[in-house]
């Protein structure tokens, strides 16, 4: 029979493991166990008060399964951090975490990955590694380029009102607009969407004419809207 010393106390018998003390400053963790999300969804940790020791908070966020998943931390506010995996989560899997000393988990669905190719004027969607649809698209014009990088679906709106004043363009400016837009899939909080744009169908596949959004035909936008969910990745490449 083994004797194990833990924190100054002595336990006799099987090896004892100290129960982790939960971080009471953690208010919520997303995704929750009840959610099935896309393979690019970040882990979002909200704290009750602003975090002064960010390094300690980051150390308390650990991926248990799958093993060897690494990522980066993005503090979007003094009390909210996003853990963004370097690689996409495995599809159709349970992801297990430790956050603030407490176990958490969520599930991923299919791997629905969209690639917007700015120079090829295409928007290609693969589901579980198989190309499901390649669509002609129009991205941001030179003055309003679509940002390059990997993004995730933040929400869906059908319809949504898009107003150029929210990005600093007055309505009476030649570039001004206020439009009701269908099948809008948000990929940045700054206002970049993938959406239906019947007015630019003639340019889709040939030229980039938008104010930064990814324009699709109504039919293609509806298909994407109906096949995409929160956390699905959108990769914009030059």
PLM regions: where:
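Acidic, low-complexity Ser/Thr/Gly/Pro-rich repeat segments typical of extracellular/periplasmic
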Residues: 1-8, 12-112
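Low-complexity, Pro/Ser/Thr- and charge-rich linker/hinge segments at domain boundaries
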Residues: 17-19, 107-130, 145-148
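Solvent-exposed coil/turn segments that connect beta secondary-structure elements
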Residues: 48-50, 66, 76-78, 86-88, ...
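Short, solvent-exposed loop/turn elements at domain surfaces
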Residues: 54-56, 123-125, 146, 160-164, ...
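Exported/periplasmic cell-wall-interacting domains
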Residues: 110-113, 141-148, 164-238
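Conserved hydrophobic/aromatic pocket- or pore-lining residues that grip, position, or stack substrates
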Residues: 123, 153, 185
């Amino acid at each position: 029979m083994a004797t194990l010393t833990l924190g100054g106390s002595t336990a006799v018998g099987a090896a004892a493991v100290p129960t982790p003390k939960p971080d009471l400053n953690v208010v919520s963790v997303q995704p929750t166990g009840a959610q099935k999300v896309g393979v690019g969804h970040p882990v979002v940790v909200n704290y009750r008060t602003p975090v002064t020791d960010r390094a300690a908070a980051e150390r308390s966020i650990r991926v248990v399964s799958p093993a060897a998943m690494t990522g980066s931390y993005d503090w979007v506010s003094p009390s909210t951090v996003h853990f963004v995996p370097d690689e996409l989560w495995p599809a159709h899997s349970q992801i297990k975490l430790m956050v603030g000393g407490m176990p958490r988990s969520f599930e991923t669905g299919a791997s629905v990955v969209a690639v917007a190719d700015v120079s090829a004027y295409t928007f290609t969607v693969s589901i579980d590694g198989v190309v499901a649809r390649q669509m002609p698209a129009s991205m941001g014009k030179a003055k309003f380029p679509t940002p390059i990088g990997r993004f995730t679906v933040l929400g869906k709106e059908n319809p949504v009102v898009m107003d150029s004043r929210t990005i600093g363009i007055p309505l009476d400016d030649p570039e001004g607009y206020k439009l009701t837009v269908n099948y809008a899939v948000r990929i940045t909080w700054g206002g970049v969407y993938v959406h239906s744009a019947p007015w630019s169908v003639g340019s889709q596949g040939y030229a980039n004419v938008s104010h930064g959004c990814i324009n699709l035909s109504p039919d293609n936008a509806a298909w994407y809207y109906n096949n995409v969910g929160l956390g699905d990745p959108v990769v914009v490449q030059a």
